[in-house]
Amino acid sequence: TAAIFNAEGSTVRMPVRGQEDLIEVDSGSLPGSLQATSPEKVAPAEFDLVVLAMQEPQYSAAGVRELIGRVAASGVPTMAITNMPLLPYLARIPGLETASLRPCFLEPELWDAFDPDLMTLCSPDPQAFRPPDEKPNVLQVRLPTNFKAAAFANEVHTAMLRNLDAGIEAARFESPEHGALELPVKLRVYDSVFVPLAKWAMLMAGNYRCVRAEEMRPIKDAVHGDLEASRAVYDWVVGVCIELGGDALDFVPFEKYANAASALASPSSAARALAG
């Protein structure tokens, strides 16, 4: 996989407002460079920011778990894009007893070496998938929403995220066919540690309810098949987050979520994984 990325770069396809067809962004046509390598060859201390973009159980894989140890030892600010908020991030929520949550993780010891002040969370709201008949360097965005990241504990580290936020906001993609385009997926930075937890309600009301005893169902059907049941699940999860200390404004209104879910005509990745 690394060889393909290094030889061909990456290709991301996404819908853009005002365009009938998907817009294809090829990394080879952009400034900067993209490099891929195997876990044992990565030196985290050489980077300004580490992004953990897999799901929590995958970090226990041989080679990857050793890399995670080096990331923690490096002291480099780390942003997780995971459905499951990692233990160091949960430790940043005032009053939350994280010791009782350790059984929820495949290998909780993996995260013990991280400084909570160096960990933040980014809600993985954009829906994307790898087309099954394409190479692994191709990604297709199904629902282009924004990434929502919480600030780091240290404003120096947060400034790096805010610079990324501003740079992405100002950037325009020069399409050979359509000229300068504003791409829809942004990075937004918030002061509240609860903003990335908005994903919890979406997962419980939609993604995980795609799982059925005999078959999967699309997220759209999971949410809209019984809209009031979905609303009840969604509002209950948001209520838990508010009881933990969040503000109602930290979370996405159910109506906005339900409207977005109506475009999700495939089962969630969690349902597909369980279905084998």
Task: Describe the role of every protein-language-model region.
Residues 18, 84, 254-255:
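Residue-level "edge-of-site" marker
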Residues 39-86:
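Rossmann-fold NAD(P) dinucleotide-binding segment
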Residues 1, 274-276:
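Extreme N-terminal leader/targeting regions
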Residues 145-273:
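C-terminal substrate-binding/catalytic lobe of Rossmann-fold NAD(P)-dependent dehydrogenases
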Residues 3-5, 59-60, 87-90:
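Short active-site-adjacent helix-start/loop capping segments
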Residues 45, 74, 79-206:
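Rossmann-fold dinucleotide-binding core
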Residues 2-48, 57, 68-69:
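Conserved N-terminal Rossmann-fold NAD(P) cofactor-binding segment
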Residues 9-10, 64-67, 93-96:
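Short, glycine/charged-enriched secondary-structure capping and boundary segments
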